[in-house]
Regions:
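Rossmann-fold dehydrogenase core element
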Residues: 112-129
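Beta-loop-alpha module in the N-terminal Rossmann-like domain of NAD(P)-dependent dehydrogenases
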Residues: 56-114
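N-terminal Rossmann-like dinucleotide-binding module
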Residues: 1-53
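Short active-site oxyanion
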Residues: 34-37, 72-74, 124
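Aromatic/hydrophobic pocket-lining residues that form π-stacking "cages" and hydrophobic walls in ligand
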Residues: 46, 86, 113, 138-139
Length: 143
């Protein structure tokens, strides 16, 4: 029996700092993700981040990036205060969102975007490493 080929998830990243490199490297190592776009406030920084990954598409306009058909999802690693509005833009354009912590300082904002994602059949989640949470380690002996 032949296995179905794995579908690559095309994603873009917002943010060009070290955490973005770390996330992108892990995503690419999985063999399931393809970095296809980068957003930065300046074209120069965006191009510098994109070059080692062979990415040619760099945006300086979020709406433009959200509207592109070159991505299925976005990874948000911008300053915390921008997370909610940036996530909203991408969810409204039908893109899955993975956002660095915190999603927001306000639970009502998160609940609103969770509802929007659910309504549109999208994934909206916080990029958090569960394996390092104490709850995971506490539960391990019971497995």
């Amino acid at each position: 029996m032949e296995k179905e080929p794995k579908t690559m998830l095309r994603f873009g990243t917002i943010g060009t700092g070290w955490i973005s490199n770390s996330y992108v490297d892990g995503a690419l190592d999985s063999g399931l993700w393809q970095l296809t776009a980068v957003y930065s406030r300046t074209k120069e920084k965006g191009l510098a981040f994109a070059a080692p990954y062979g990415v040619k598409t760099v945006f300086t306009d979020l709406e433009e990036m959200a509207a592109t058909d070159k991505i299925d999802a976005v990874y948000i690693a911008s300053p915390n205060k921008l997370h909610i509005e940036q996530a909203r833009v991408f969810l409204e354009h039908g893109k899955h969102v993975i956002c660095e912590k915190p999603l927001s300082a306000h639970a009502k904002d998160v609940a609103e975007l969770q509802a929007l994602a659910k309504e549109r059949g999208l994934i909206y989640l916080e990029a958090i490493m569960f394996m390092h949470l104490s709850l995971i380690h506490i539960s391990e002996p019971t497995r």
